[in-house]
Amino acid sequence: MLASPALAGARAFAATVSGSLGIPIPAISAPSPSQARRRASLVVVAKVKVSTPQADRIARHVRLRKKVSGTTERPRLSVFRSNKHLYAQVIDDTKSCTLVSASTMHKSLSKDLEYSAGPTVEVAQKIGEVIAKSCLEKGITKVVFDRGGFLYHGRIKALADAARENGLDF
């Protein structure tokens, strides 16, 4: 069997160490072809795609935006929620402009809203009422609802229901 240069170097190093230190080092030999095949067959490569909840939400939102678009007649009611705030805006996608917006960041609303650990369902209902009233003042009665990739549950549902109850049609 032919020895590789690396194997020859390892043998030479072992002989040098063994001779100079007086420590016996066992002989280094190359694996037999069957051993090499067995070792090579044990190598397993696994590719795992890791996704985060935020990445999943963005993917849902991209899928949703392919189907939902706001027009001048029916603008898009877009909702975004974070851990601290809740935002809603009515957007005309043909002109790329925001027509109406409401959020927990607005000074007029933040004075009325009291919460410490992020917006609650009651806060979402208040935002839904405000956005619906603002839309009706501007003459907007029909919108397309864009949940922003979030599940239609909890705060998102409360905002949508409050907007419907106050005159928006979607």
UniProtKB/Swiss-Prot annotation:
Keyword rRNA-binding among record annotations: yes
Cite the entry's keywords alphabetically.
Chloroplast, Plastid, Ribonucleoprotein, Ribosomal protein, RNA-binding, rRNA-binding, Transit peptide
Q: Where would you find the membrane-spanning parts of this chain? A: none
GO BP terms in the entry: translation
Please provide one cellular component term from the Gene Ontology annotations of this protein: ribonucleoprotein complex
Q: Does the keyword Ribonucleoprotein apply?
A: yes
The record's annotation in Pfam families points to: Ribosomal_L18p (PF00861)
Look up the transit peptide and give its residue range: 1-63
Q: What is its main location?
A: plastid
Which Gene3D superfamilies did the record assign?
3.30.420.100
Domain of life, per the record? Eukaryota
Protein's cellular compartments: Plastid, Chloroplast
CDD domains assigned to the protein according to its UniProt record, in alphabetical order: Ribosomal_L18_L5e
Q: How does it assemble?
A: Part of the 50S ribosomal subunit; contacts the 5S rRNA.
Q: Which family does it belong to?
A: Belongs to the universal ribosomal protein uL18 family.
Q: HAMAP family of this UniProt entry?
A: Ribosomal_uL18_B
Q: What does this protein do?
A: Binds 5S rRNA, forms part of the central protuberance of the 50S subunit.
Q: What is this protein called?
A: Large ribosomal subunit protein uL18c
